[in-house]
């Protein structure tokens, strides 16, 4: 055990005397040694919303079996909808407290939210940069009923982390009557589908051992995006902590079915981790300050969040030349995930796909040159090219359509080989005029 758990309960009894009365936000000293109840957590998250409305929104994903709210703290710079370059903010999803007796997992979710909220209020440039470019969605306590009863299961005696609709089976202990038979898990999945379908990181927090585990749990096979997970592993080992175990959950923990991690990756297409923060369970407090005890884990979370931009394929066109019956495309992948089935589309003025290429792949942090058959491509006024690809290799990964700036497109004449910029409306007019003057036949329609 990484903390002195035997003394933890003693200090709780001596220092706090009893659980904090739910009438005010928890004092820092009590918060450092006494784990959250549903009541004290509710007070804390509501105080955040009241005190920091510019960066905190509080919503409920639904209610537990006993009617407790599943609070989600949404954290971002809400004064701006997008990033400064106009692109959408990245999204991160975090949950804690699937197992009510795994309190340090819940506390890590709380500390992660607290770091960015308080950092914003204290003008910390790291927190400010993240919140200007990222939305954090954090369900700190998923199983509030189990938390207050200090029980692993919910009040139906179901293990919520065996109840997701991904390789669910009755062979797992206490997996429920069927996938999503419990309100806590169905609410969590519904929140993912409503708010964070395009998230590029999902971390679910637990205790039981010490590991950062990626998919899969149901099979020993490596995930499709093993390159991404192995890059993250190597980067953390080199720059943060070389001893933190990071591997697939099936081998690193034990085989499991119906978990939120495998659902997040296999159904939602997120890069997912289970963060097992400690082997402690059932204790209600800690002798060591919680922020010190989870300092390394918080540093890992900060790393994962700060670099979320890289946790997908990020295709960037270096050049696009169209002439004759081919498009010569040069594209770089700035992300740490590969994409296996990208295509180039040509969109007409009405927004319809007029032409698309065959598939090509671009490996993580790599470069690809492709010669694409364009014999059926005719350019039209108002048309443009776009890249169509999946953000990761896993089948469930989100598809994206990213327009290519016309300044990157060159049109090659059949006879001279000259390269001209792709036509804007003005360029179309100029090109037609020049064509009339010079009596040149062009290979494409203006």
Positions of predicted regions on the chain:
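A generic secondary-structure signal
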Residues: 47-48, 78-81, 115, 190-194, ...
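Short beta-strand-to-loop junctions in surface cap/lid or active-site-entrance loops
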Residues: 72-87, 97
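Short glycine/proline-enriched loop/turn "hinge" motifs that connect secondary-structure elements
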Residues: 83-86, 151-153, 263-269
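C-terminal accessory segments enriched in acidic
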Residues: 26-34, 168-170, 174-418
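Short glycine- and acidic-rich boundary segments immediately preceding or forming the N-terminal edge
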Residues: 24-70
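Secretory targeting signatures
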Residues: 1-25, 408-446
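Active-site/substrate-binding loop(s) of hydrolase catalytic cores
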Residues: 86-98, 102-226, 230, 234, ...
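Short glycine-aromatic motifs
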Residues: 53-59, 134, 242, 348-351
């Amino acid at each position: 055990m990484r903390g002195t758990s035997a003394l933890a309960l003693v200090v709780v009894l001596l220092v706090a005397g009893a659980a904090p009365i739910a009438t005010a936000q928890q004092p820092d000293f009590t918060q450092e040694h006494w784990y959250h109840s549903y009541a004290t957590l509710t007070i804390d998250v509501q105080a955040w919303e009241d005190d920091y409305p510019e960066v905190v929104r509080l919503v409920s994903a639904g209610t537990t079996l006993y009617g407790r709210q599943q609070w989600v703290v949404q954290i971002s710079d809400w004064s701006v909808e997008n990033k400064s370059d106009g692109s959408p903010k990245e999204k991160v999803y975090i949950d804690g407290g699937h197992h009510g007796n795994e309190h340090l997992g819940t506390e890590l979710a709380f500390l992660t939210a607290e770091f960015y909220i308080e950092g914003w209020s204290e003008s910390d440039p790291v927190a400010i940069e993240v919140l200007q470019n990222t939305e954090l969605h954090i369900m700190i306590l998923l199983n509030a009923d189990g938390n207050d009863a200090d029980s692993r299961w919910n009040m139906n005696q179901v293990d919520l982390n065996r109840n997701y609709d991904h390789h669910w089976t009755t062979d797992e202990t206490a997996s429920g009557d069927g996938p999503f038979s419990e309100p806590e898990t169905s609410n969590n999945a519904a929140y993912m589908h409503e708010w964070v379908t395009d998230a590029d990181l999902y971390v679910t927090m637990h205790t039981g051992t010490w590991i950062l585990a990626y998919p899969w749990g149901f099979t020993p096979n490596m995930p499709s995006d093993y390159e991404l997970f192995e890059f993250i592993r190597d980067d953390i080992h080199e720059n943060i902590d070389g001893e933190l175990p990071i591997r697939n959950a099936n081998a690193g923990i034990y085989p499991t079915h119906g978990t939120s991690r495998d659902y997040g990756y296999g159904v939602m297409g997120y890069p997912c981790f289970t963060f097992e923060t400690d082997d402690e369970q059932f204790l209600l407090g800690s002798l060591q300050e919680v922020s010190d005890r989870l300092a390394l884990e918080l540093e890992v979370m900060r790393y994962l969040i700060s670099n979320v931009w890289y946790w997908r394929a990020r295709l960037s066109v270096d050049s696009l030349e169209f002439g004759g019956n081919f498009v010569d495309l040069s594209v770089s992948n700035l992300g740490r995930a590969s994409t296996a089935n990208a295509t180039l589309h040509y969109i007409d003025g009405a927004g319809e796909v007029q032409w698309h290429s065959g598939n090509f792949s671009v490996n993580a942090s790599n470069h690809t040159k492709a010669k694409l058959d364009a014999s059926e491509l005719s350019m039209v006024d108002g048309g443009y090219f776009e890249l169509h690809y999946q953000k990761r290799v896993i089948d469930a990964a989100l598809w994206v359509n990213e327009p290519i700036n016309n300044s990157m497109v060159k049109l090659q004449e059949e006879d001279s080989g000259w390269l001209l910029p792709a036509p804007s409306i003005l360029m179309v007019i100029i090109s037609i005029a020049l064509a009339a003057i010079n009596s040149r036949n062009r290979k494409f329609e203006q």
